[in-house]
């Protein structure tokens, strides 16, 4: 579903969503999985609007997802082509206006970053590592729950947990770097 190249032989599936599959005319070949996931409901919304199910005033408001799309795009370290840059810019605009899920706001607080002046640095080096650390050292669903919860108290609790896991990851990483240096010096 993203910027990774599909295998030479594709699985037997009803639907394969990948901008890199043969015959796909997608202009943004480096779109992250979160961007593909965001584009799917956008396309469905457009089709339903065309069929008269709703109009522009009554259609689902998908822009509320842009802060998560921006975070995922930066944290996935994809090339910031025009499409990805636009998604990140729109997501950052909402974050700076404090129009974001409470879990994202809690992650800003737990990481000591300021949402009103958020940059891609915050996504790539403060929030993203906290979410990813849970998947490496604990349970990846902690990060997902933090981003998706509507309960501010639960979001705060999860963000603090994620921050603690990330601190543990940094200690482990530092120990590994120190061990590698000792091995390198002994050669």
Where are these predicted regions, by residue range?
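Amphipathic alpha-helical transducer elements in NTP-driven molecular machines
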Residues: 10, 31-34, 38, 85-89, ...
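Active-site flanking residues adjacent to catalytic metal/cofactor-binding acidic residues
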Residues: 1-3, 75
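Short alpha-helices
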Residues: 12-54, 62-74
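Short, glycine/polar-rich helix-capping loops at beta-to-alpha or helix-loop-helix junctions
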Residues: 3-12
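Hydrophobic helix-and-loop "lid/oligomerization" segment in the mid-to-C-terminal part
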Residues: 46-187
């Amino acid at each position: 579903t993203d910027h990774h190249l599909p295998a030479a032989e594709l699985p037997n599936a009803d639907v394969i969503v990948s901008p890199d599959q043969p015959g796909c005319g997608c202009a943004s070949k480096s779109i992250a999985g979160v961007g593909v996931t965001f584009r799917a409901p956008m396309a469905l919304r457009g089709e339903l609007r065309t069929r008269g199910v709703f109009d522009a005033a009554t259609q689902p408001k998908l822009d509320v997802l842009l802060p998560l799309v921006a975070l995922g795009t930066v944290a996935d370290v994809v090339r910031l082509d025009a499409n990805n840059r636009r998604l990140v810019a729109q997501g950052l605009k909402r974050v700076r206006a404090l129009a974001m899920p409470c879990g994202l706001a809690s992650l800003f607080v737990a990481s000591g970053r300021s949402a009103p002046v958020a940059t891609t640095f915050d996504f790539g080096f403060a929030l993203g590592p906290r979410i990813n650390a849970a998947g490496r050292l604990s349970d990846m669903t902690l990060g997902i729950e933090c981003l998706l919860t509507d309960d501010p108290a639960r979001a705060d609790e999860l963000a603090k947990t994620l921050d603690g896991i990330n601190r543990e990851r940094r200690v482990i990483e530092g120990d590994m770097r120190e061990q590698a240096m000792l091995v390198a010096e002994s050669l």
